[in-house]
Regions:
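Intrinsically disordered or low-complexity boundary/linker segments at protein termini
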Residues: 1-16, 75, 101-107, 124-167, ...
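Small/aliphatic-rich secondary-structure junction motif
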Residues: 1-50, 150-200, 224, 252
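Structural beta-alpha unit
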Residues: 13, 20, 47, 51-55, ...
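Gly/Ser-rich helix-loop-strand patches that form or flank binding pockets
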Residues: 23-27, 90, 95-144, 246-290
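General small-molecule cofactor/ligand-binding pocket signal
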Residues: 33-35, 81-85, 134, 181-183, ...
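Generic structural signal for helix capping and beta-alpha/helix-loop junctions
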Residues: 42, 92, 142-143, 190, ...
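A short acidic, glycine-rich active-site loop
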Residues: 51-63, 200-213
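Hinge/beta->alpha junction and helix N-cap segments in small-molecule ligand-binding domains
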Residues: 57, 158-160, 185-188, 204-210, ...
Length: 290
């Protein structure tokens, strides 16, 4: 399935995800498919206390149709494809998103504990998808009051995945006429129990190397059509905290799923994981090859 796939479960997080997905579909001229996973113990009457043993896929589809129309309006809802799947939500979304240009999920769904930063479905999708994925938090906005996207922050570390993230962000910024801020983080090596080794490390040299890496990545991306040049930020400290701090007041964060560190077999790196959990705005995570 190509285009955008968005998970829907009638929660506030799903409403925010659906609105985000609808805007992306219009900008990129992609098809939009809303997916509702249902089961006989997870029905959609608007009353969670009601259990109907005769509940059917047609009833699930009607619930999905009504919800999309409620969130986007009846006219916009006619442009949204619907898919109902009798399966576990994460598995239904991952299967539906095979070949998709973007998978969009709300940060939190109907179930689970409110104290958790990400729900179980969004976490499973985040860790197992091989497609670009957007994590969207619920906000007190309506389609009429949704602000234009003005700032996009991108994490860069010199890896091919971070280059792909910057390219994706630039394409998004070009469509939205938004600014792009590319951030690279650096720090001195941890010498542990051998502090005297640190005298051989020159902070200026490490900072210069980070800036050179950032320049190499940014200069290699076609930024034509942006309202202003890409801003380059060299941050001393942890990459994830630098991205989150810089993104205060931003409208979107874009990071690669895996950077230069960690274990190559993992689909999601520590920076992407931390940013997805703590970001103050929607996050798009780009896998290798996109």
């Amino acid at each position: 399935m190509t285009g955008i796939v968005v998970g829907v479960d009638e929660s506030d997080g799903a409403a925010a995800a659906l609105r985000f997905a609808s805007r992306e579909a219009h900008l990129h001229r992609w098809d939009l498919t809303a997916v509702l996973a249902w089961g006989y113990l997870n029905q959609h009457h608007g009353d969670l206390s009601v259990f109907d043993p005769e509940y059917s896929e047609s009833q699930a589809d009607e619930a999905l149709r009504a919800y999309v129309a409620k969130v986007l309006g009846p006219d916009e809802a006619t442009h949204v494809r619907r898919r109902t799947v009798c399966d576990l939500p994460a598995r239904a979304l991952l299967e539906s998103a095979t070949g998709a240009d973007l998978l969009v999920v709300g940060a939190r769904g109907r179930g689970g504990f409110k104290s958790l930063l990400l729900g179980s479905v969004s976490q499973q999708c985040l860790h197992h998808t091989t497609r670009p994925i957007a994590i969207v938090r619920a906000v007190e906005r309506t389609p009429e009051t949704e602000p234009a996207m003005e700032r996009i922050v991108v994490g860069v570390d010199g890896s091919q995945t971070s280059r792909a993230a910057l390219e994706w962000a630039v394409q998004e910024a070009r469509l939205r006429q938004a600014s792009v801020e590319a951030l690279i983080a650096w720090h001195l090596p941890n010498v542990g129990a051998f502090p005297y080794v640190g005298t051989a490390f020159d902070p200026a040299a490490f900072e210069a190397a980070a800036r050179e890496t950032l320049d190499h990545i940014v200069d290699g991306v076609d930024a034509e059509g942006l309202p202003r040049p890409i801003e380059r930020i060299v941050h001393l400290g942890d990459a994830s905290s630098g991205i989150i701090t810089t993104a205060k007041g931003a409208d979107l964060i874009v990071v690669g799923s895996r950077g230069l560190g960690g274990f190559s077999g993992l689909l999601l790196g520590s920076v992407g994981h931390h940013v997805a959990h703590h970001a103050p705005c929607p996050v798009v995570i780009i896998p290798p090859g996109d």
